[in-house]
Amino acid sequence: MKLHTLKSTPGARVEKHRVGRGHAAGKGKQAGKGQSGQNKRHGHRLGFEGGQTPWFRRIGKRGFTNVNHVEYQVVNLKDLEQNFKANATVDLESLFKANLIKRSMPVKLLGNGKLTKKLNVTLHAASKSAIDAVEQAGGKFTIL
């Protein structure tokens, strides 16, 4: 193999086509644009959807996202039941080791599922039903 014998892979180098220059050129009349009409013409502005009511007009003008709202990671009672032994301490570190949460956000315990083991739970927040279930199983819930 020598440099002067190297060839490009098929399809890597495509010859330039001058479009809209007559039938004989191979790309005359519609110039590869299909039918005449709106889509044959020049481009369109940002947000234009072809006459359909655009997204920014379909959504409402009301409401906003509160910059101070807290977004919680959710852990359910069934997750605690599956991943922890009786009399265990459930905190952020143990939940992270059990692969139930990421470190970045606060955690809220919700009451989905049943809890039969006595656990000591220390988290940022919990629903009323989750706290009741932990205490009914003989455990204790503490807010961080």
Curated annotation (Swiss-Prot):
Region annotation Disordered: where it falls in the sequence: 1-52
UniProt feature, compositional bias: Basic residues: 15-26
Cellular compartments per GO CC: cytosolic large ribosomal subunit
GO BP terms in the entry: translation
Entries under InterPro entries matching the protein: Ribosomal_uL15, Ribosomal_uL15/eL18, Ribosomal_uL15/eL18_sf, Ribosomal_uL15_bac-type, Ribosomal_uL15_CS
Any Pfam family hit: Ribosomal_L27A
GO molecular function: rRNA binding; structural constituent of ribosome
Source domain of life: Bacteria
UniProt keyword list: Ribonucleoprotein, Ribosomal protein, RNA-binding, rRNA-binding
Reported function: Binds to the 23S rRNA.
Subunit details: Part of the 50S ribosomal subunit.
PANTHER family: 50S RIBOSOMAL PROTEIN L15 (PTHR12934), LARGE RIBOSOMAL SUBUNIT PROTEIN UL15M (PTHR12934:SF11)
Family: Belongs to the universal ribosomal protein uL15 family.
Protein name: Large ribosomal subunit protein uL15
Organism: Mycoplasmopsis agalactiae (strain NCTC 10123 / CIP 59.7 / PG2) (Mycoplasma agalactiae)
